[in-house]
């Protein structure tokens, strides 16, 4: 099993119908199951994906004229060997105060019917490699204490719990840092099997 991470800001990287179908499959479970989609989270039709979502993904990747509180971010689609969109992951290239507190550098989601197959770990590992290649030294990843699968994924990729803070809504958020390899330290290795 493997995945290929493709940047969603590249024209034609992922078909808009595939993205829309992914959004629908995530939302069929619950309204907030489409985390890790960045600006695509707000799309409620195929037309919105085309006219708003993907252009906004490209704008965030360029860092052009971002609204207050937004940072440059790269959006990736995780495709299995058959080309099925199994997950999405976003790498935020900087942290605002809010992201530093409870948002982090990385957000991800896995298609509901593809969970518990190791995709989240593969996606996070690939995203961490991209972050290191961009010169990032460490990244912050957060999750809810009740999201045991995400916690295991973060730990499997080297996450170290710093603390637990309340979100704006008062819900606890676990904050994990992952140190990234530099040229002198070599490759980071996974500590556990993917979940």
List each language-model region with its residue ranges.
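Conserved GNAT acetyl-CoA-binding A-motif
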Residues: 131-142
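Conserved acetyl-CoA-binding loop-helix of GNAT-fold acetyltransferases
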Residues: 107-110, 116-133, 152-156
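GNAT-family acyltransferases
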Residues: 1-105, 112, 130, 169-195
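Conserved beta-strand-loop-alpha-helix junction that forms the acyl-donor binding cleft
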Residues: 141-151
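Charged catalytic carboxylate motif
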Residues: 18, 123, 149
